[in-house]
């Protein structure tokens, strides 16, 4: 009888263990299914995708607005810079300007300004370049603050500049290549210092440096 009781107890324990393991496996499977359903919830994924799409659209709109703002700012600036001068204004500028020929190709606008600054206040120096390759053409224009300074500048004709004898003439109407209907190269920069722009094909100095005095006409000019 004792052996039978022990056998029954063992069978009962085994059945109990099997039932317990079965319940645990069922619970684990249920948890895994729930986790899987949460990970691949189509509604949640759709919401996430929509939020991402909205963020991308907002970023595109922001970039487009930034581009529009830049274009508007650039357009207003360009508009101010390209306001055409009247014929009278161009002629008045020409009366205060000289043509300088045989300029060394390596010369800068600042060097020309230094060479002529003893003649009077200089508003602008422009070295013309070829539009195709950006190389200097070998001549320049100098605009003074007053037409009275032009006579002094003409006395600089045939002086040496960077080892070359330059040619200085008044900028006149009807002179080939020196028409008053043509302004200085576009894109000139106002302010002190030289500015070089290959795109606009010119090197320009703009400023107002006080005259230091001209030491007479000779083959050498000492500006200081």
UniProtKB/Swiss-Prot annotation:
Disrupted-gene phenotype: RNAi-mediated knockdown results in reduced alpha-1,3-fucosylation of chp. RNAi-mediated knockdown results in overproliferation of testicular cystocytes undergoing transit amplification leading to increased incidence of spermatogonial tumors.
Subcellular location per the Swiss-Prot or TrEMBL entry: Nucleus; Cytoplasm
Domain of life: Eukaryota
Keywords: Coiled coil, Cytoplasm, mRNA processing, Nucleus, RNA-binding
Tissues with expression: Expressed ubiquitously in all transcriptionally active cells.
RNA-binding recorded as keyword: yes
Region of interest (Disordered), ranges: 1-40
Entry's Gene Ontology molecular function annotations: poly(A) binding; RNA binding
Chain segments annotated as coiled-coil in the UniProt record: 9-74
GO biological process terms held by the UniProt record: co-transcriptional mRNA 3'-end processing, cleavage and polyadenylation pathway; mRNA 3'-end processing; mRNA splicing, via spliceosome; nuclear-transcribed mRNA poly(A) tail shortening
A GO-annotated cellular component: cytoplasm
Transmembrane segments: none
Domain RRM: 96-173
Biased composition (Acidic residues): 1-36
Role summary: Involved in the 3'-end formation of mRNA precursors (pre-mRNA) by the addition of a poly(A) tail of 200-250 nt to the upstream cleavage product. Stimulates poly(A) polymerase (PAPOLA) conferring processivity on the poly(A) tail elongation reaction and also controls the poly(A) tail length. Increases the affinity of poly(A) polymerase for RNA. Binds to poly(A) and to poly(G) with high affinity. May protect the poly(A) tail from degradation.
Quaternary structure and partners: Interacts with ZC3H3.
Domain remark in the UniProt entry: The RRM domain is essential for specific adenine bases recognition in the poly(A) tail but not sufficient for poly(A) binding.
Protein name (Swiss-Prot/TrEMBL): Polyadenylate-binding protein 2
Organism encoding this protein: Drosophila melanogaster
């Amino acid at each position: 009888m004792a052996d039978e009781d022990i056998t029954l107890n063992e069978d009962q324990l085994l059945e109990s263990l099997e039932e317990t393991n079965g319940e645990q496996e069922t619970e684990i499977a249920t948890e895994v299914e729930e986790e899987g359903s949460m990970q691949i919830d189509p509604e949640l994924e759709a919401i996430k995708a929509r939020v991402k799409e909205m963020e991308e659209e907002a970023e595109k709109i922001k970039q487009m607005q930034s581009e529009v703002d830049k274009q508007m700012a650039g357009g207003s600036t360009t508009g101010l810079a390209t306001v055409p001068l009247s014929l009278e204004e161009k002629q008045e500028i020409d009366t205060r300007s000289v043509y300088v020929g045989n300029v060394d190709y390596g010369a800068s606008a600042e060097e020309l300004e230094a060479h002529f600054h003893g003649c009077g206040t200089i508003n602008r120096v422009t070295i013309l370049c070829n539009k195709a390759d950006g190389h200097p053409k070998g001549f320049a224009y100098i605009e003074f603050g007053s037409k009275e300074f032009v006579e002094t500048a003409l006395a600089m004709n045939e002086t040496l500049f960077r080892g070359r004898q330059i040619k200085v003439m008044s900028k006149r109407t009807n002179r080939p290549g020196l028409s008053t209907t043509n302004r200085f190269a576009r894109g000139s920069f106002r302010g002190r210092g030289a500015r070089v722009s290959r795109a606009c094909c010119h090197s320009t100095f703009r400023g107002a440096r006080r005259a230091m005095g001209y030491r007479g006409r000779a083959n050498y000019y000492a500006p200081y």
